[in-house]
Design a protein with these regions (language model features):
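Extended, aromatic/histidine-rich regions of cofactor-dependent oxidoreductases associated
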Residues: 1-159
Length: 159
């Protein structure tokens, strides 16, 4: 597809508004609740900015050692930290893969040294250098679109 990606350049058109081609105007929209003149209304907006998002994708075990792995998506702003929380414990700093680039998915890992048998809740959060922290589900603005669910995503794993 790549409807708004340059392939062959025949002419340049400059505009002062966001390009809303066929797919952007139909598929990349979100509804969010806004207060307009004292009345709450659902307003359609185009998806524009990549918000901070991290998610745990798997927990592996090798030789009795457990490792939590995940990814980060962001808008290219440098990442200050990725942290992992297990059950009600403290946040622990994860290691970001050094091969990650500014706009790429950033992979992270966290050594879970004291894993015990049973069900556990694991969650990650990312913070950028400007102090922005990935929101929790409770802090996520009212939206009804699947495109912008960037809240922390707790997962239950069984050891």
């Amino acid at each position: 597809y790549g409807v708004s990606n340059v392939k062959w350049l025949n002419q340049i058109h400059i505009q002062d508004t966001r390009y809303m081609g066929r797919f952007m105007g139909r598929d990349y929209v979100t509804l969010k609740k806004e207060n307009i003149g004292g009345v709450e209304r659902w307003v359609e907006n185009s998806v524009t900015t990549m918000n901070l998002k991290s998610s745990i994708v798997r927990v592996t075990e090798m030789g009795g050692q457990h490792e939590i792995q995940g990814f980060v998506l962001n808008d290219g702003t440098s990442i200050e930290s990725v942290e992992v929380k297990i059950d009600d414990g403290p946040w622990g700093r994860a290691e970001i893969n050094p091969r990650s680039t500014k706009y790429s998915w950033k992979l992270f890992r966290y050594d879970w040294n004291d894993a015990t048998p049973g069900d556990h809740t694991v969650v990650s959060r990312v913070t950028d250098v400007n102090g922005n922290v990935q929101v929790t589900a409770e802090e996520l603005p009212d939206k009804v679109s699947r495109w912008e669910n960037y809240a922390q995503f707790p997962r239950t794993v069984r050891i």
